[in-house]
């Protein structure tokens, strides 16, 4: 399953495409809108995806919609320092 897709007229607009296929080789440029949607799947039990709608602004990924994560559901011991820093910066916005 891909990790995201473009946003536009179609449900899965291209480019960009965040996956292993050829479309994923297209560089994300300023003003492109796309999703970042990592997922976790536990075979035979469940799957969950967190989708964040974003756009590229001056070479930096910016969220279109801002909703904080429920921190009590995050196991911070599984995050590296860069991930913790990103989460803290995201929460401040």
Residue ranges and their predicted role:
Residues 2-4, 10-93:
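Charged, cofactor-coupling segments
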